[in-house]
A protein has these predicted regions:
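NAD(P)+-binding Rossmann beta1-loop-alpha1 motif at the extreme N-terminus of oxidoreductases
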Residues: 1-68, 92, 154-160, 191, ...
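Hydrophobic beta-strand scaffold residues
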Residues: 30, 52, 116-117, 265
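A general structural signal for well-ordered alpha-helical segments in protein cores
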Residues: 42, 63, 73-76, 105, ...
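Rossmann-like NAD(P)(H) cofactor-binding subdomain of soluble oxidoreductases
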Residues: 56-68, 72-135
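Rossmann-fold dinucleotide-binding core
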Residues: 99-180
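Helical "substrate-binding/catalytic lid" subdomain
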Residues: 167-264, 270, 274-295
């Protein structure tokens, strides 16, 4: 079991800063490094008790565990590769919370060669250390993961998702894909609502319609996701009472209405094309989850 009272933190952007403040509140001794020392977040962490170290090697050598939270993997490679064989990293554990692809995480394990966990943070900086926050972790093994769980749990619910270094990134990006898909549809809906003619409810504003109608509708649909996922697991795409042929006509009506009302529905158009392809190539009596067969390469 590693002693986790001393932690180093590399990268003090919005996310790194939130992670750092949560660690300080948990009474950790924190050594911090950031490319730009003059960033106000550096001052805020030093004021809260962190020690700023201008040298990256010293920062890492100061604690058994170092958290990395920078912009992207090319940045990690740029700052860490030059010191990867130095004494500073010997016997250290790295927890990388930088967003990236599964392949980038696997490649990092290759060139890093030290103990490294890769993480996906399912939280915005404001959510860190609240019940809404959870963190996927992968790499090494579950036993070694248990030696760093007490750090991860400072920020949110810790979920170990496997030894494959890329597993956390895959889970993280899958959730974000769901989020951006939802945003794409929701923002198209908001644009359409914005086009309401005077005399209708546009004076109440888009926000009240989103709160009063769109959000309850999306919330009511969440169990449908689980039913679609079950179809995907079984490879049998029942209609679930809503055959894709019927849904495809509804989708075409959305695209047509957007054209008529002056809304760009491009973010839905590609998906509508996939639905049409399923209808054209299959019976059209199955469910919308059958689209997944066109996505899997
Ligand atoms: N913020 C969010 O909502 C999400 C929540 C989920 C996780 N993401 C990922 O976390 C990584 C860091 O995100 P961030 O929000 O902290 O990002 P920024 O505020 O833009 O800070 C970027 C830090 O990266 C440093 N940096 C950038 N380029 C370099 C470089 N060439 N060399 C050294 N450091 C670099 C930057 O340093 P500086 O500009 O202050 O000198 C910041 O410390 C990210 O992967 C998210 O996807 C956030």
């Amino acid at each position: 079991m590693e002693s986790n009272s001393k932690i180093s933190l590399v990268g003090l952007g919005n996310m790194g800063t939130a992670l750092g403040h949560a660690l300080l509140k948990d009474q950790k001794q924190l050594t911090i490094w950031n490319r730009t020392a003059s960033r106000p977040s550096v001052t805020s962490l030093v004021d809260a008790g962190a020690v700023f170290e201008p040298d990256l090697s010293w920062t890492i050598s100061n604690s058994p565990v170092t958290i990395i939270c920078v912009l992207d993997y090319p940045t990690i490679r740029q700052i860490l590769y030059p010191i990867v064989n130095s004494h500073a990293l010997k016997s250290k554990t790295i927890i990388n919370l930088t967003n990236g692809t599964p392949r980038e995480a696997r490649e990092m394990k290759e060139w890093m060669r030290h103990a490294i966990f890769d993480g996906g943070t399912i939280a915005t900086p404001d959510m860190v250390a609240t019940p809404a926050s959870s963190i996927f972790i992968s790499g090494e093994n579950e036993q070694r993961f248990s030696s760093v769980t007490n750090i991860i749990e400072v920020w949110g619910r810790a979920q170990y998702v496997g030894q494959d270094p890329g597993a956390a990134a895959l889970n993280d990006l899958a959730l974000l894909a769901g989020m951006y898909g939802m945003f794409a549809g929701a923002i198209t809906a908001m644009a359409l609502l914005k086009k309401q003619k005077s005399g209708s409810r546009e004076h109440s504003g888009v926000e009240s319609q989103v709160t009063g109608m769109l959000n309850p509708w999306l919330q009511a649909l969440l169990p449908y996701h689980a039913k679609m996922a079950e179809s995907i697991d079984r490879g049998i795409f029942e209609s679930l009472g809503n055959p894709i042929q019927m849904q495809s006509i509804g989708m075409q009506n959305i695209l047509k209405a957007c054209d008529e009302e002056g809304v760009d529905a491009g973010s839905l158009r590609y998906f509508a094309g996939l639905m049409e392809k399923v209808v054209a190539e299959r019976s059209g009596e199955g469910g919308i989850a059958e689209v997944v067969t066109l996505l899997l390469k």
